[in-house]
Regions:
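Catalytic cores of the polymerase beta-like nucleotidyltransferase superfamily
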Residues: 1-438
Length: 438
């Protein structure tokens, strides 16, 4: 993977002005691995005040920490070499001292895979002699991992995220430092934890991520509600795995969409709470309803947006719906209950749930329900009051006084239409009205 021309131009202009300029961080790592970098960072001995006059378009956000963003076709972060002071808030250093040394700069980075640099000609610079970790596929802290995690506890989740994204293993010293320091994640804002969790779930190896969050003890501080699921025997012929193992495998079978993967992670969170044992057979009556309540608490705590919370909680609540024998009218109610936008996520969750259960795997009821829903949507059959051929004005014309009862009448008419779509005309609904809804 070559360095893009806009990045080379910025590096070249810095060098012509007498400054050092190196591509650093994740972009170098990704290029060495043959991956297309998502963004590009340049490190230099030039201060922000020296960088800004060199380029026509510069965003000064981050200037306090030595960073400005140069706009040259693409946004490129340019940061002054620096040495960090003590970290007092578990996120940012108390002070930032600018430096003129690339080696000093890379010493402050989190992991060795992010501590490499490259010239504009593509020559690799490795002041700490750590490039072997790229080829060994290791996630390893720069220096003492305990110090790195005390500086910023989110780095523990980042280590797991990089392992999931790159398919690397976490080195033993780094992994055991995560276990020792897991409690420190409680000092990190929920918003930052949420963002890392989402990246782990959307990686190519979400199962690895959830497993590592568990074994490293981080999960008990992030989603402690899942702790009871670990090793929980389901005592069921339908399940050949404990609850947490089933959850992890379900996540692995879902497509790479955040809502469905969050729902997979939380769909059985209430099983330990609702467990009963009758004649040696385990039952989890109402776990989908209790799970919806628990999922809402978890997602609110993690500061997910209301739309995501609503969608995921719907998926958790409805993940057992395939077991219902639904008449056409009830299929339409099901569509209304789930929401058209959530249907595909729900069916993907249900299929993943079955795949993660004990064989044989029967997808018949899920696929039949999916087919019924698709037919109803394709035929544009009425589903809500808004789809009725009449509205409140028509009811007024037919002699009804405006008020709360009007909404109730429209809902009753919708019930008739759900049963028989053919009645959804102005004339047909007027007959229904005259037949008993005055």
């Amino acid at each position: 993977v070559e360095i893009p021309r806009p990045v080379i131009e910025v590096m070249d202009r810095l060098e012509k002005a007498g400054f050092q300029a190196y591509l650093v961080g994740g972009s170098v790592r990704d290029m060495l691995l043959g991956r297309e970098p998502k963004d590009y960072d340049i490190a230099t001995d030039a201060t922000p005040d020296q960088v800004k006059p060199l380029f026509p378009k510069v965003i000064p956000a981050g200037e306090k920490y030595g960073t400005v963003t140069v706009l040259n076709g693409i946004p490129i972060e340019v940061t002054t070499f620096r040495k960090d002071g003590r970290y007092l808030d578990g996120r940012r250093p108390e002070s930032v001292d600018f430096s003129d040394s690339l080696e000093e700069d890379v010493k402050r980075r989190d992991f060795t895979i992010n501590a490499l640099a490259m010239t504009k000609e593509g020559v690799l610079k490795d002041p700490l002699d750590v490039q072997r970790d790229i080829w060994l596929e290791h996630i390893h802290c720069v220096g003492d991992p305990n110090e790195r995690f005390n500086e910023d506890a989110l780095r523990m989740m980042r280590a797991i995220r990089f392992a999931c994204q790159l398919g690397f293993s976490i080195s033993a010293p780094t992994y055991y430092a995560i276990r020792r320091n897991a409690r420190l994640i409680s000092n990190v804002s929920w918003e930052r934890i949420r963002d890392e969790l989402a990246k782990i779930l959307l990686s190519e190896r979400p199962c690895m991520g959830i497993s590592l969050l568990g074994t490293s003890r981080l999960m008990q501080y992030i989603i402690p509600e899942l702790s009871d699921c670990v090793g929980f025997d389901q005592h069921s012929e339908h399940h050949d795995k404990n609850v947490m193992a089933h959850i992890i495998e379900t996540v692995g079978w879902t497509p790479n969409r955040l809502n469905v993967r969050l729902a997979a992670l939380l769909h059985d969170v209430a099983k330990p709470k609702t467990f009963t044992l009758v004649d040696g057979e385990g039952h989890f009556y109402g776990h989908h309803l209790e799970g919806e309540i628990m999922a809402r608490e978890i997602l609110n705590r993690l500061r997910f947006d209301n739309h995501t919370i609503g969608a995921v909680c719907t998926l958790v609540r409805e993940h057992m719906s395939r077991y219902e024998f639904l008449r056409p009218r009830n299929v339409k109610r099901f569509i209304n209950r789930v929401g058209i936008d959530n249907l595909n996520d729900l069916f993907d969750l249900q299929i993943a749930d079955i795949k993660a259960s004990a064989p044989p795997h029967d997808f018949g009821m899920v696929l039949a329900l999916k087919e019924d829903c698709q037919r109803i949507l394709n035929e544009k059959e009425p589903l809500t009051v808004k789809d009725l051929a009449i509205n409140g004005h028509d009811l007024c014309e037919w002699g009804m006084t405006p008020g709360k009862e009007m909404g109730a009448i429209l809902k009753k008419m919708l019930e008739c239409v759900l049963e028989d779509p053919g009645v959804n005309t102005r004339e047909g609904l007027k007959k229904v009205f005259e037949g008993g809804f005055q």
